[in-house]
From Swiss-Prot:
Gene Ontology molecular function: DNA binding; DNA-directed RNA polymerase activity; magnesium ion binding; zinc ion binding
PANTHER family (UniProt xref): DNA-DIRECTED RNA POLYMERASE, DNA-DIRECTED RNA POLYMERASE SUBUNIT BETA
Recorded name of the encoding gene: rpoC1
Keywords carried by this UniProt record: DNA-directed RNA polymerase, Magnesium, Metal-binding, Nucleotidyltransferase, Transcription, Transferase, Zinc
Name the UniProt record assigns to this protein: DNA-directed RNA polymerase subunit gamma
Length: 625
């Protein structure tokens, strides 16, 4: 086996490709000296043999074999012939997966403008040429001629547009016997555009623009700066303006635009194949018309159709009529495949499905601490399975991975104990789409729960913008020690109390919490059950309430030796009683204090309700933990 080659790279740069580079992408030289790579036929596969047609859109000579280690004609079959190029069919004997990256190219019989740079916003071609977009379109789509060189004609200027009649008039003057016009050049179509772009001297243009900007003001200055910025970018990247007009177009690998046979014998194919077929057909027809020296008007019409076919291939619907397939559905062009939510970048590169992740519906978990989440058992055993298997083997409970998996599938009780050990101190990350700010993904300590729903603390809902009407959340397990440390130190819910946008607290009590706190501490004079009773501790009060001995809002006395704060002054006793044993009882507004003869406090009972005791007890427990 050959060692796998790993190419180290820092970034991917997207820019203009020169015709030479496009040709390099697809061109290969066979051992017999034959150069392959150009796609010349619109055919895809032979419907009798179901094999790709040579020089077609699925050609095995250009893109590689359709079957592993097998050439087109069948002379070489087996891995032992690796690297051999069949002398009969010219197909290299290699793996079929090369068809995922080998490209081809189509050499165009006439240059065509790239629709992104022509019809994009802003139109870079029109900015560079300093012409209105409407005029540039007139040239590209063969509606108007453009003066490439005025020569000695006084009535003509460089880049001036001419109608058909005006050009015929000038042509008559040029070819008349007593003609004085010399050096007049007029063009039409993308060829004229190519000439205009090639004539631009970027450095010289940038220099003169900088001088003009110094004197210009207002709208004109803004326009000049816009043009200078484009020119500077061309200089910085080393791209040439004429590369925006294509003489060669790349053909993407066949496995990225597949053709598959359906059950009924029919074929389903990617829309790109239809768009490429249109381009090849029109290109071949144009080449044939040029060969037989067809009338100019016919050739020009074919060039316009080729331009439209390439436009549809690159960005269908950007200009002119949208090309539709069967059942009037617009065909998906290269731009449609790249852009949008379902495009290659967002769907396949940024939005990959990842291992060690799961998703489920969320339900409220009011008994959880803010840094905890309830993770269903069956989800946890799946997510943490490698860790559990490792722990089972290390502890000697099983000898190999297969035995460990069998133990897990049998739901052996020992597995749950191991799982508890594994998840202790191992944070998980919860994410709710759409992740609009950094608090859309936070980490929690998992607590194993029954059922199939993830339990979420109600206080973190505003950060996730979550509610419990069927929302789903994704769980991700950080694997490396570094990621676990980051999850614990930076992403733990208890560390994300303030909103990154406003700096105000995002974890604030609301709804049930506020209502519950209000109800516990509210006054209700009608609550009389157990009113006036004395209790020796806060725990006794809670126990009496749980046994339904007292009402939640009944006023009672409970012994409490700590300090008491009140929003109302309570320093002067309302009533003082001298007891027979020499002690005194001081009755304040909210407490009852018993003192000895020296004034030392013997006991203190506070006047409160069971609801307030429960509320106070909950806060004390939270602070203590």
């Amino acid at each position: 086996m050959r060692p796998a080659q790993t190419n180290q790279f820092d970034y991917v740069k997207i820019g203009l490709a020169s015709p030479e580079r496009i040709r390099q992408w697809g061109e290969r030289t066979l051992p017999n000296g034959q150069v392959v790579g150009e796609v010349t036929k619109p055919e895809t596969i032979n419907y009798r043999t179901l094999k790709p047609e040579m020089d077609g859109l699925f050609c095995e000579r250009i893109f590689g074999p359709a079957k592993d280690w097998e050439c087109h004609c069948g002379k070489y079959k087996r891995v032992r012939h690796r690297g051999i190029v069949c002398e009969r069919c010219g197909v290299e004997v290699t793996e079929s997966r090369v068809r995922r990256h080998r490209m081809g190219y189509i050499k165009l019989a006439a240059p065509v403008a790239h629709v992104w740079y022509l019809k994009g916003i802003p139109s870079y071609i029109s900015i560079l040429l300093d012409m209105p977009l409407r005029d540039v379109e007139q040239i590209v789509y063969f509606n108007s001629y453009v003066v490439l060189s005025p020569g000695n004609a006084e009535t003509l200027t460089y880049k001036q547009l001419l109608s058909e009649d005006q050009w015929l008039e000038i042509e008559d003057q040029i070819y008349s016997e007593d003609s004085v016009l010399q050096g007049v050049e007029v063009g039409i179509g993308a060829e004229a555009l190519l000439r205009l772009l090639a004539d631009i001297n970027l450095e010289q243009e940038a220099e003169s623009l900088r001088e003009e900007i110094g004197n210009a003001k207002g709208q004109k200055r803004a326009k000049l700066i816009k043009r200078l910025r484009v020119i500077d970018n061309f200089i910085a990247t080393g791209s040439k303006p004429e590369w925006m007009v294509m003489a060669v177009i790349p053909v993407i690998p066949p496995d990225l635009r597949p053709m598959v046979q359906l059950d009924g014998g029919r074929f389903a194919t990617s829309d790109l194949n239809d768009l490429y077929r249109r381009v090849i057909n029109r290109n071949n027809r144009l080449a044939r018309l040029q060969e037989i020296l067809a009338p100019e008007i016919i050739v020009r019409n074919e060039k316009r159709m080729l331009q439209e076919a390439v436009d549809a291939l690159i960005d269908n619907g950007r200009r002119g009529r949208t090309v539709v397939g069967a059942n009037n559905r617009p065909l998906k062009s290269l731009s449609d495949i790249i852009e949008g939510k379902q495009g290659r970048f967002r769907q396949n590169l940024l939005g990959k499905r990842v291992d060690y992740s799961g998703r489920s519906v969320i339900v409220v978990g009011p008994k959880l601490k803010i840094h905890q989440c309830g993770l269903p058992r069956e989800m946890a055993i799946e997510l943490f399975q490698p860790f559990v298997i490792n722990r089972l083997i290390r502890s000697g409970m099983v000898n190999n991975i297969k035995a460990a998996k069998k133990l897990i599938s049998r739901n052996d009780p020992s597995v749950w104990d191991v799982l508890e050990e594994v998840i202790e101190g191992h944070p998980v990350m919860l994410n709710r789409a759409p992740t609009l700010h950094r608090l859309g993904i936070q980490s929690f300590e998992p607590i194993l729960v029954e059922g199939r729903a993830i339990q979420l603390h109600p206080l973190v809902c505003p950060a996730f913008n979550a509610d419990f009407d069927g929302d789903q959340m994704a769980v991700h397990v950080p694997l490396s020690l570094e990621s676990q440390a980051e999850a614990r130190l930076l992403m733990l819910a208890s560390n994300n109390i303030l909103s990154p946008a406003t700096g105000k607290p995002i974890i604030t009590p609301s709804q049930d919490m506020v209502l519950g706190a209000y109800y516990l501490t509210a006054e209700n004079p009608g609550a009389t059950k157990g009113a006036g009773n004395y209790f020796s501790s806060l725990e006794d009060v809670i126990m009496a309430f749980q046994q339904d001995q007292i009402d939640l809002h009944a006023y009672i006395y409970v012994r409490f030796d700590g300090e008491i704060e009140s929003d109302q002054p309570d320093t002067e006793p309302v009533k003082v009683t001298e007891n027979e044993d020499g002690t005194r009882t001081l009755l304040y507004k909210f407490r009852r204090v018993r003192q000895d003869a020296k004034g030392n406090v013997l006991s203190q009972y506070i006047y409160t309700t069971p609801g307030r005791v429960i509320y106070n007890n909950a806060i004390q427990e939270a602070l203590a933990s």
